[in-house]
Amino acid sequence: MEKLLLIGINTRSMLNSALKLDYDVFSTSYFSTSDTPKIENQIIILEEKDDESSGIFEDKFNSKEILEKSKDYIDEADYIIPISGISPNDFSRKDQKKILGNKDVSKIEDKFRFYKEIEDEFNAPETFLINDVDEAIEISKNKPNVKYIIKPIKGSGGYDINLLNNDSSIQLNNGEKFMLQEYVEGINLSSSILGSRDYKKTIMNSRLLTENDFKSNNSFIYIGNILPLTDESILTKVKDIAKINEEMIETSENLAYKFDLIGSNGVDYIYNKKGLYVIEVNPRIQGTFECVEKSLQTNMLDAHIKSCQNENVEIPKAKYYAYKKIIYSPCRNKYSKINLDNIYDLPHIGTITEKSEPLLTIIDKDSDFKKLYEKVENSSRIVNMEAKIHQQDAI
C-alpha cells in the first residue's frame, strides 16, 4: 500500500478524507484537536495538558520544527500533501518530487512578486514594496484619497495586516518583508479550483468571511466561508449574482492556467462597484475544503490526488449550502464539553485557550440557507457564552 503524508497546521479534516482512501496514511499536525482521528503514524506538535495554556499560535508555530520532526515520515512517504502552514518550497528538491500539488509556488507565495506577475493582465490593487512605515506614509501622501494597508509579503489567514493612517504606530517585524497595498473596500469572495496538467476548472465560488464582517474592526483575520455563492449566501444586495459568478469562474481559471496550478487551489477576491479585484492565490488545499465536501457530498482529497495524477475528475453539482465559522476565543478560558453536533477542531477538555486564539470551528450544511445561517449563528452564540462561563484569570 502506498504511503501518504499529510503535513501542516491542522490535518484533521484531510485526515478524515484520507482514511476513506486506499493509502497508508501518515500525519504531522501542529494542532492537537481532540476530534482528530488517531492513527499509527502520527506526530502532534502542540501538547495540550489539563490546566495549561496552549499559548499564542503566532509565537509558537514554526514550520521548520514541523519539517524537522517529520524527517522520517518524509523519507518513508511515497506522496506528500502540504497544507496550510507548510510551503512546497520548504522541501528539498528530492522530496518535492513526492508532493501531490504545486511544487514551486515562489511566484505566488511572495505576494509582491505575485502582484508584479498579474498587474498587466488582471484587476488588482496597486501595491508597493516598502522598507518601513515612514516610506509607506510618504507613498500614501501622494494619493490622499486612497486608503492603504500594510501586509507581509508572505503569510496567510489575514494575520499581520494593518490599515495605514498617517499617525500609524504599526510595528513591522524585523527580518520580514512588507508591502503597501491599496485598500479595496467591498465583499470578500473566493473560488475553489481543481487543476490537472490538461485542464483547470472552477468547482465552487464562496463568500469569504473575515473578522471585519462581524465586528467592523478593520481586522482581516480569516473567519470562514459560506458556499455556494448565491443571492442569499453573499450576505449583501448585489445586482447580478450570475455575472459575478461567471467573472470569478473565468478569472480563476485564467489564473490557474497562468500559474499552471494543479490539484485543489483557491483564489481570493474583493468585489465592489468598480469590479472584481484579485487579492491572492492560495496554491494548496484551502480553508473551504470541508465546506466543499459537505456541499458536493464528495471526497475532495480524492479529487485533489486524481487531478495531480492527471486523471479526469467529475465534480457533482452542489447539493447543500455549507457554512464554516472559526470561533476565536472571546476570553482566556478553560475548555469544557459543549453539546453541539456541528463543532469541530475541539480543544482537549481542561486545556486553556488564550483570548483571541482559535477555539473551535463550526461547520454545518443545509439545503435551506436561512436555516443553515441560523443554526451556525446560534451555535456561535452558545460557544461564546460557554467560553465566558469558563473564563480564566489572565496570567
Predicted features and spans:
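Conserved metal-phosphate-binding beta-hairpin within the catalytic cores
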Residues: 253-290, 327, 334-335
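Hydrophobic anchor at the start of a short beta-strand
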Residues: 25-26, 124-125, 178, 323
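ATP-dependent carboxylate/phosphate-activation module, predominantly the ATP-grasp catalytic core
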Residues: 185-189, 193-260, 282-306, 317
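Short acidic-glycine loop/turn motifs at beta-strand connectors
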Residues: 165, 195-200, 271-275, 309, ...
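ATP-grasp fold ATP-binding core
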Residues: 118, 140-163, 176-191, 203-207, ...
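A conserved helix-loop-beta module that forms one wall/lid of the active-site cleft
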Residues: 97-165
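ATP-binding N-terminal substructure of ATP-dependent carboxylate-amine bond-forming enzymes
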Residues: 1-109, 134, 377-378, 384, ...
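Peripheral (often C-terminal) accessory segments that flank ATP-dependent C-N-forming ligase machineries
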Residues: 302-395
